[in-house]
Amino acid sequence: MAFIAKSFYDLSAISLDGEKVDFNTFRGRAVLIENVASLUGTTTRDFTQLNELQCRFPRRLVVLGFPCHQFGHQENCQNEEILNSLKYVRPGGGYQPTFTLVQKCEVNGQNEHPVFAYLKDKLPYPHDDPFSLMTDPKLIIWSPVRRSDVAWNFEKFLIGPEGEPFRRYSRTFPTINIEPDIKRLLNVAI
């Protein structure tokens, strides 16, 4: 079993440009973490909605995208290729993320990123689909398999301004529909 951090603020990641992203700097802001893939059927929808949320709450929300290849190999780009894939292929049209993308990682299994080990421990299943599991067991390419595993691309985790994981959302929950929960956490009028 992977090491599980004691606090959200003990975690970190490495951005696509190689810089350390220290979660301790997120104190006082809500954080939305989403495992992403540039070749998924909902890539365009989810990436544009992530940009929209980041733009709506520029100083009070941090959005982090974690590219992952564990679901249908739908993030088969290397780290240095991901931004060009998003810009020219999907969503395309010159798309540029307004949020931070970190280096490609695993979200399940023996080599899962510590961020996902922590989040899955605190939020073991999506609130909107507590029975969410991988729909086709032949697609599972990691071990060990756990009930709390991320089921597919674009699962989301919302963390409150005090660093407490608040809610986990399934792959089918539209990213933009998280806005009322973000407002609630930030005490913004809905």
Swiss-Prot record:
It catalyses: 2 glutathione + H2O2 = glutathione disulfide + 2 H2O; a hydroperoxy polyunsaturated fatty acid + 2 glutathione = a hydroxy polyunsaturated fatty acid + glutathione disulfide + H2O; tert-butyl hydroperoxide + 2 glutathione = tert-butanol + glutathione disulfide + H2O; cumene hydroperoxide + 2 glutathione = 2-phenylpropan-2-ol + glutathione disulfide + H2O. Gene3D superfamilies: Glutaredoxin. Its EC number is 1.11.1.9, 1.11.1.12. It comes from the Eukaryota. Signal peptide: none annotated. Keywords: Cytoplasm, Oxidoreductase, Peroxidase, Selenocysteine. The active site is at 40. The keyword Cell inner membrane does not apply. Homotetramer. Belongs to the glutathione peroxidase family. This is Glutathione peroxidase 2. It comes from Callithrix jacchus.
